[in-house]
A protein has these predicted regions:
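Compact, glycine-rich, soluble single-domain proteins
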Residues: 2-95
């Protein structure tokens, strides 16, 4: 699925992902490829993104985005936001 993470300051990430774990109002939830359409509010917490392929150039990432040793998992701390998934495209507006 295509993921776009946007903050008021910048576009933090845009790319193809396998799964995204999000801090929802009622706890953590995960969105996988081909998930049903959804709109949800987010609370303060950490977003975990499982990439479909390792990142080749991590130097261009915003400093809020952390990458694991395999370059296949991103984590981003957020203060809240909103997420919408339609047609296998996930748009995340984060604070």
């Amino acid at each position: 699925m295509q993921l776009e993470i946007i903050t008021p300051e910048s576009n933090l990430f845009s790319g193809e992902v396998v799964a995204v774990q999000l801090p929802g109002k009622d706890g953590l939830f995960q969105i996988l490829n081909n998930h049903a359409p959804i709109i949800s509010a987010l609370t303060k917490g950490t977003i975990k993104v499982d990439l479909s392929q390792p990142l080749k150039n991590t130097k261009k990432l915003n400093k809020r985005v952390q990458v694991d040793a395999s370059n296949k998992v991103l984590t981003i701390d957020v203060d809240g936001g909103v997420v919408e998934l339609t047609n296998n495209k996930l748009i995340l507006l984060a604070e």
